[in-house]
Amino acid sequence: MHLKAFGKVNLYLDVISRRKDNYHNILTLFQSINEHDDIFIEFSESEIFESEPPLNISWDNNIIKKSIETFKKETGFDNFNLKIKLIKNLPMGGGLGGGSADAAAVLNFLSKNFKISEKDLFEISCKIGSDVPFLLKGGTAIGKGKGEILEFLEPLKLNIQIYPMNYNIDTKKMYEKLDQNWKSINHFGDPYNLYEALKNNDIITAKQNAFNVFEQVAFKEYPKLKQKKEDMEKDEGIIFALMSGSGSTLYKVIYAN
């Protein structure tokens, strides 16, 4: 079976506070994008995984394997193996949720085959990664907590152009940079105001509320990202440009319907 694992951008992303479990509370506006990985998957006598191009992480550390193992543990359906071929189109470490999208696609495949409830599948996804719960369904949603507290909204119809940059940014490192510089970090905008502005083609309000807190640390580490974003903001017809996730992918929103 051929699965499409659609990525996401964060139209708004702020880090609100650090949690006792060493994670962070975030506030974000998730938006699905057309860009996706392709996954060819079938049940098999033995576990087989291959990727084009080859990944720079081992299978044991792959979030797809984590999703399969977590599914087996949580459901008790553990007497199966999968043959998976991943065509990796979304950039690694790019902020588009590529690995999480792959995990979500495989979970949806397993859920349909083993008839797992939506509630149970959601709970499994929360154990795998912060973006996985949203990517199970996709569309447009406000995310809170670690990203797993979701408020799905009427999907926005946006023209989003993606600009992958040649930096594999470590999310953990970016959170550490935020923590180290917390007192000097600025927070502004509102994801609900941004959503309404994009829904109603209110360009001025959209510009005022589009925000990614990670730009304040990522742009110091990678100055070329800042320069590229500033160049993009000069483009004709643009509503706003932003970095997605903890980086490094940049994107621009051209118009909203």
Swiss-Prot record:
Pathway where this protein functions: Isoprenoid biosynthesis; isopentenyl diphosphate biosynthesis via DXP pathway; isopentenyl diphosphate from 1-deoxy-D-xylulose 5-phosphate: step 3/6
The keyword Nucleotide-binding is assigned to this record: yes
Active-site residue numbers: K8, D131
SUPFAM superfamilies: GHMP Kinase, C-terminal domain, Ribosomal protein S5 domain 2-like
The entry's keywords: ATP-binding, Isoprene biosynthesis, Kinase, Nucleotide-binding, Transferase
Protein role: Catalyzes the phosphorylation of the position 2 hydroxy group of 4-diphosphocytidyl-2C-methyl-D-erythritol.
Protein name per its UniProtKB record: 4-diphosphocytidyl-2-C-methyl-D-erythritol kinase
